[in-house]
Structure formats: C-alpha cells, structure tokens
Amino acid sequence: MKRIKLFTAALLLAAMSAGNDMWALSTSGKKDTHPVESPKFFSGNANPLSDFIFVADPTSMEYNGRLYVYGTNDTQQLDSVGKDGKNTYQYIHSLVMLSTDDMVNWTYHGLIDVKALSPWGIASWAPSIVSRIESDGKTHFYLYYSNSGAGVGVLTSTSPVGPWTDPLGRMLVSQFTQGLGHCKAPFDPGAVIDDEGIGWLSFGGGGKGEVGTDYMPGDARIVRLGKDLISLDSEIVEIKAPYHFEANELNYWNGTWIYTYNTDWNKRTEWPHEGVDKPSICCMSYMTSHTPLDTDSWKYVDNYFKNPGDYGMGFSNNHTHLQKYKGDYYLFYHNMCCLLYTSPSPRDI
C-alpha cells in the first residue's frame, strides 16, 4: 500500500470573540444566531476553520460536491465554566456543523442539540459520520458520537445538516455491552462503510486498568455493524494498539482497513517493533488489516502526525480525520493555538 505523506497548513493566531449567545442551539441550524458565512483571516489559508466558535474532534464526509465537517462544541464548555474554569468537557452537549466547497470559505450550519434529542445522555463529543443511499432513494446520514466516556450514541438524518433524530433512545455501545471485555471507556467512535456496503465501528479508551500494560493497554475495539447501521452484528474484537489512548478512526481503501488513534502520555519503555520508530508522546499513529475481526491481523505501521506541542504549539490531546476531497487528501486535526490564555483550554480545528 502506498503511504501518503500528510502536510498541514500552519495555523494562524487570531483574536476570537464569544458573545453570551455563542451556542444558541438548533437541531437544524436555522435558529442559531451565528453568521452563516465565517469571516476569514488575511492569509486565505482558512485555519482554523471557524474564528467565532471553538471546535474539536473533527470528522467529515462529502455530499453532492460539498465537504461537511462536524466537531465537538468546546465553546459550550467555555461559556459554562468561564475563562478561569477547566475543560472537563462535562458541559458539552452539542456538536458543530460546517461545510465548504473550496477548503477556504466555510459556511456555519449551526449546532446539533444532542441533549434535546437524547435526554438520556451525559455529554456529546467526538462525532464520526457515514452516509449511504437507501431503498427510498434518499441519502441517509449516521452520526456516531461519544456519550461522555460511557459509550457511543448515534443520530440519523436524511440531510447532512439535519434535522436529526435519535433512532435508539439509548447508547449503541455502553460499558455494559456484552463481549466488551476490558474497555473502561467505550467512546470516541470511528465509523466506515466498506466497498461491500458493510459498516464498521471502532471505539475505546480508558487506560490499562488492572489487566493491561503501558505498552498494550488493551482498550481499543472494533465491531461490525448490522445492516441498519444502528446495531451490532459481530463479536467485539480487540485491536492491539500500542500505547493506545483515544481518538479512534477507521478508513477503508482498496481492501485495507486503516485504524488511527491517539497514543498516550506514557514513556515508551517497551517497543518490540524492529525497523519501526517508537511513536512520540500523544501523537497520531495508524494500523492496517485485511481481516478486521482477526485480532492478530492488525499491524502497527507508523506514527504519522506528531502532537502540536512538537511543532511549538501547546501540548494537548489530538484527534484527526483523513478526508479525500476533489482529488486531494486533507488531514483535519485540533489544537489549542487560539485558547486566548484561558484555563479551560478550548480547542480549534
């Protein structure tokens, strides 16, 4: 498999403002008070994507020639705790919707009020979206998200910007799901549909607990989804991901499943992979498989994106999404470049 080297544009530092109505909620995007068009920085690089709301944990998909990006609404936490509070993510109950047709000019489509749609939930972070054309001739969208660290929820729509509905009224995956094994935090979903139309879901985190090691925490998982994409259709299998932390993502290219994840902060004291460099601290690494439900088929390949702190920005967790759009590959990620010296440490895509 050809390896793709990823390059990202340098982020610009800029002042950002947040009014009292910064996160007025809307499931359709039509009632939100933010401007439809995002003002742009002088360079034209359009980084970060939004300059009026903090967004993290990106996912994206193309629909009718337009690229839609979804993320965690960090501004909701900032507005809840103030500039001297902490970003525990506990007050985040909504997801942000953006789109573009040129990767420079971005349109803001409002927020998905997950708390209103799924009142049983705890918090909503880190979405992952897939879509397909179904028997009614419509394109259906499936948006998986973290219900805090407790599990994975799912929302559906026939439009990329809603309105959204909760088809289950509960978590798709939880800490009590049968066959989960040692996975304290079955969150941070990464979904993909393969060439056969089969859906797959990766998730997991929470650390080694009593049975794992620093090198192999044993908390990364993958499962095949049912034909309805809102049920599970296989046993839950461990992906043996070295120094696994969170930020799970799945891609599928030419018969190969590609699993990416954020490594943890532990020292790399153990590393049995000859000829492959140890992953740096809290970086993004990836693994590949041709038979994803075979635990031993997953092979560690490389550390493909270091922590923003390694490039002179603030150290933080990371979360990436690789997207092919109009013939080019783009890597979405977040950092704390525009945190404005606030304690909550909000993030930007």
State where each predicted segment sits.
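Beta-propeller domains
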Residues: 71-106
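Bacterial N-terminal signal peptides
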Residues: 9-17
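Beta-propeller blade signature
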Residues: 95-100, 154-158, 219-225, 283-291, ...
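Short, solvent-exposed loop/turn segments at conserved positions within beta-propeller repeat blades
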Residues: 88-93, 148-150, 211-218, 277-282
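Hydrophobic core segments of beta-strands in well-ordered, beta-rich domains
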Residues: 58-83, 109-112, 125-148, 153-155, ...
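Single conserved hydrophobic/aromatic residue that forms the stacking wall/gate
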Residues: 341-349
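Blade-edge beta-strand/turn elements of extracellular beta-propeller
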Residues: 34-51, 106-117, 159-182, 224-243, ...
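Beta-rich catalytic cores
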Residues: 55-56, 123-125, 185-188, 244-246, ...
